[in-house]
A protein has these predicted regions:
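Extracellular/periplasmic catalytic domains that process cell-envelope and extracellular macromolecules
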Residues: 21-23, 51-54, 121-124, 168, ...
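Periplasmic/cell-envelope proteins involved in peptidoglycan metabolism and beta-lactam response
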Residues: 1-66, 76, 80, 291
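Extracytoplasmic
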Residues: 24-26, 39, 55-57, 77, ...
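Small-residue-rich helix-loop
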Residues: 144-292
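A small/polar active-site loop signature that marks catalytic segments
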Residues: 18-25, 65-208
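Secretory-pathway/luminal and periplasmic proteins that interact with or process carbohydrate-rich
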Residues: 37-39, 137-140, 221-222
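Short, glycine/proline-biased beta-turn/loop segments that scaffold the active-site neighborhood
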Residues: 31-48, 91-110, 215-217
Length: 292
């Protein structure tokens, strides 16, 4: 949700329909939000939570809960800005917080309830592109939960693990702890990632999946890498970085077809140089005669 969306919401809540000065009386707003202890996965490092990339994961978020750094209390920010907007339009508002309703409770809601306002998200392929091209952690975390229809990160992570197993992807040693990779408890091998890339290249939405990635020397987190090299514009990938760890995985297009590449560096002194060397070798590598 952006600030413009909040303004539209305030107008709808006051019954103005976009006009000023036609308030119907005090506005009572109940925000159904996760309790604070659920805003971050438990194993996210406390230092990460102060930065935009470690912003709290809430159901209703303004500007992805980031404003320079992370917004430490998204609910209070929403309350403050909503009250200010309603007051600016000549109204008053009372805001209270409640727990989110469950899927069961949603099905039990009365049919006579009326939706006053709805904010539609960007299309799925745009959200996936934000997560993969720009490594936007908040979006990645929300996509994990929405895909599993489970806001509990442990349940959502278990659902992702089961899906990979159902696809025939080797999951030995795999541990999914969150959606963004910021947790130090994630465990994955380059074999698993390469197998996932190959499987997704056969998926009905393969074109959308590849288009969601950064492009070497052109776009996203790879925009400043491999410029002027043979792989510029020919490698679609996803990068990952936490303290001491550097990873890159993706699809390298060659004259002999696609190569599914995954590299994970732990504690290397110059990982980017090594990654570049390996990508160039793979690009120039011809397939074995027996595989043609």
């Amino acid at each position: 949700l952006g600030i413009a969306g909040l303004q539209r919401f305030a107008m709808a809540a006051m019954g103005q329909g976009g006009a000023r000065g036609t308030t119907t009386g005090p506005v009572n707003l109940m925000v159904r939000e996760e309790p604070r202890q659920n805003w971050w996965p438990n194993d996210w490092h406390p230092a990460d939570r102060a930065y935009a990339y470690g912003a709290p994961i809430t159901r209703l978020a303004l500007t992805s809960n980031a404003l320079g750094g992370a917004v430490s209390d998204p609910y209070r920010r929403l309350e403050t800005l909503f009250k200010k907007e309603v007051k600016r339009r000549g109204g008053s508002v009372q805001v209270q917080q409640a727990r989110p309703i469950t899927n069961t409770q949603q099905t039990q809601q009365s049919d006579d309830q009326i939706v006053l306002h709805e904010e539609t998200s960007a299309p799925m392929h745009a959200l996936l592109s934000l997560a993969n091209t720009e490594s936007h952690n908040f979006t990645a975390e929300v996509l994990l939960r929405q895909a599993a229809d489970q806001w509990d990160v442990r349940a959502a992570s278990a659902s992702a693990h089961r899906w990979m197993q159902q696809q025939g992807i080797p999951v030995r040693g795999l541990r999914v702890a969150d959606g963004s990779g910021l947790s130090r408890n994630n465990r994955v091998s380059s074999q698993t990632i390469a197998a996932l890339l190959m499987r997704m290249d056969q998926h009905p939405y393969a074109a959308y999946y590849q288009a969601s990635m950064a492009i070497a020397g052109q776009r996203g987190t790879l925009r400043n890498y491999f410029i002027g090299s043979p792989i510029q514009g020919k490698f679609w990938g996803k990068t990952g970085t936490i303290s001491g760890v550097r990873s890159i995985s993706g699809i390298l297009q060659t004259s002999d077809g696609p190569r599914y590449v995954s590299m994970i560096s732990n504690g290397a002194s110059r990982p980017n140089a090594t990654i570049g060397q390996i990508l160039r070798i793979v690009y120039n590598l011809s397939p074995c005669p027996s595989s043609i």
